[in-house]
Amino acid sequence: MRASRYLIATLKETPADAEVISHQLMLRAGMIRKLAAGLYTWLPLGLRVLKKVENIVREEMDRSGAQEVLMPAVQPAELWIESGRWEQYGGELLRIHDRHNRDFCVGPTHEEVITDLIRNELKSYKQLPANFYQIQMKFRDERRPRFGIMRAREFLMKDAYSFHVNQESLDETYMVMYDAYTRIFTRFGLDFRPVQADSGSIGGSSSHEFHVLANSGEDLIAFSTESDYAANLEKAEALTTLKQAPAPSKDMAKVATPGQRTIESVSEFLNLPAEQTVKTLLVLGEAEEGKPAPIIALVLRGDHVLNEIKAEKLPGVASPLTFASDEAIEAAVGCKPGSIGPVNLPLRTIVDNSAAVLANFVCGANEEGQHLTGVNWGRDCEIKETADLRNVVEGDLSPDGKGVLVLKKGIEVGHVFKLGDKYSSAMNATVLDENGKATVMQMGCYGIGVSRVVAAAIEQGHDDKGIIWPDALAPFEVALVPLNMHKSDVVREKAESLYAELLQAGVDVLLDDRNERPGVKFAEMELIGIPHRVVISDRGLAEGKVEYKGRRDTDSTDMTVDTVVNFIKEKLKK
C-alpha cells in the first residue's frame, strides 16, 4: 500500500472526551471516528487491524471444527419471551417495533436464535455434537458507553454455540474450544491468562474468561506463582493459613469509641491493625410470601472485602445481593451500622473462614459508640456457619496448594461457558436419543470480543509515542520510508525495488511515498505502531546501506541493502 493513496487521518491533539489510552490512540492514529455515544466508524487503518483479529479467530474456529453461520441482528421478541429473558435482560436490550407493531430487539447475543434454528434443523443424536459460530456486530444499550471501543454500544463479536446429547460430549467440546482460544490469543501475540470465572447472567455451570493483562484493566485476576491456577476476583477461592483460632489470651472488654464508624477509624482510635478487627455486614435474606425479608449478618476480617458474588450464592441470601437499610438495621439490632458485631447478635450469622480463625479481636458491641476488645470465638461468641465470603488478596495460598496468589489487572476479551440445558430446556430443543426418546440438548457458549481485542492490545502495548502492535495485529508489518524520494532518483528507484520485493515475499508493507518532512513521517509511523521501519536515504545508499528500527527498539541499525529483505522475512517468520 502506498501512503499517498491511503487515508492516514492522524491527529496531533488528543480529543478531550477520550479517557483511556486505547481510545486516545485509536482516535489519534486515525483508526476510528465517533458517530454518536458508543458508536464508531472504523477507518481503513483500524479496519485492517480488526480484520486481522477476525481472520485469526476464523481460522482457529474452522480448525476446531466449528461451522460458520450468520444470524439476523434483529430478533423477534417471541424467542426472548420463550427463554424468559425478555424481561430479565434489562435496559441493555434495545427493544424496537416494526410497522406492524410487532416487538423485536437488536441482538446483544444469540442464544435464543441459534437454539430456535437448531431445534428445527437437528432431529437425531447422530447429528451431534454440532458447533456453530458467527462473527457479527452486536448491540447493547449501555447506560454509559465509555472508553471508546472498550465499552461501546455496538461491537464486533465472535459467538459460538455447541449442542450435545449429554454432558460428556459438552465437556469434550468445551476443552476443544478452550484450546482453540488459547491458540487464538497466543497467535495474537498478547500476554493473556485464561481464568476460572462466574457464569453470570448467561447462566450455566463451568466458565472461563480470557484476560489480556494491562495496567488499565478493569478486572482483577488472581493466579498462582507456581501453577496454572488462575481465577477472576469473583471466583477465586480464599484460603486461610490457620486451621483454627489460637487460644484466648485477653479478656473481653467494652470500650467507648465515640464517632468511630469505620474499620479505619476504629483501628486508628484503638491503635491496632485492621486485620485484628471484624466487621459485620447486614444483608437481606429471601423473603417468604407476605413476610418482610429477614436480615442476615456476614462477618469478615476488618481488612478484607466482601465478595458479593460469593455472598449472593449463599443459601437463603436474596439475589441480587441487597444490603439492609439503616432503618431495618436499627429495628433489628438497636443501633446504627458502625457499631454492630457478632456477640449476642439476634440474627442468622455467617462468618468468613479467615475471620473464624481470629483470636482476641475487636468488633462492634451492638450499642451506639461502643466496641468490644479481646473477643474470642467459642468463649464469647458461637460460630454456627462459616463460608468463603471475601475477595482474595496477594499472598493468599493458591487453592490448588501450589504457591501463593498474585493479583494483576486484566481486560476480559473472551469467555467460554457450559450452558447446560438453560436455553434448550426453556425452548424445548430436543433430539431423539439412541432409544428413540426425546432428550433435551446440552449447550456450550463461546464468545470473543473481536473489536475489544483491538483496544486491549493497545492498552497492553503502547508508549509515549503511540501504539506498539504485536506483528500479527499491526495494520502494516513494515513501514518503508524513503527520504527525499521526489527529488532523488536513486532513493525512489531503490524504494520501489524494495517495496516490490517485500510485497513478493508476502510482507504487509506501507510505502510512505508522501512528500512530507522526515520527522512527520517518523512520528506518524510510530503513532500508528508499525512494528518494523526501513529508512532509505541518499547518504545511506552511498554506502550501500539502509536504516532499520524496530518499534520497540531504542536505536536504529544500519544494514546492507542486499540483506534487508531477508532480515525482515526472518523477523516476521515469513
Swiss-Prot record:
GO CC field: cytosol
PROSITE patterns, A to Z: AA_TRNA_LIGASE_II
Top-level EC class: ligase
EC number(s) reported in the record: 6.1.1.15
Top-level division of the source organism's lineage: Bacteria
One BP term from GO: prolyl-tRNA aminoacylation
SUPFAM superfamilies named in the record: Class II aaRS ABD-related (SSF52954), Class II aaRS and biotin synthetases (SSF55681), YbaK/ProRS associated domain (SSF55826)
A GO molecular function held by the record: ATP binding
Keywords: Aminoacyl-tRNA synthetase, ATP-binding, Cytoplasm, Ligase, Nucleotide-binding, Protein biosynthesis
Keyword Nucleus belongs to the record: no
Subcellular location: Cytoplasm
Catalytic reaction equation(s): tRNA(Pro) + L-proline + ATP = L-prolyl-tRNA(Pro) + AMP + diphosphate
Record remark: domains: Consists of three domains: the N-terminal catalytic domain, the editing domain and the C-terminal anticodon-binding domain.
HAMAP family: Pro_tRNA_synth_type1
Function: Catalyzes the attachment of proline to tRNA(Pro) in a two-step reaction: proline is first activated by ATP to form Pro-AMP and then transferred to the acceptor end of tRNA(Pro). As ProRS can inadvertently accommodate and process non-cognate amino acids such as alanine and cysteine, to avoid such errors it has two additional distinct editing activities against alanine. One activity is designated as 'pretransfer' editing and involves the tRNA(Pro)-independent hydrolysis of activated Ala-AMP.
Family (UniProt): Belongs to the class-II aminoacyl-tRNA synthetase family. ProS type 1 subfamily.
Subunit structure: Homodimer.
Protein name: Proline--tRNA ligase
Organism of derivation: Hahella chejuensis (strain KCTC 2396)
Organism placement in taxonomy: Bacteria, Pseudomonadati, Pseudomonadota, Gammaproteobacteria, Oceanospirillales
Encoding gene, per UniProt annotation: proS
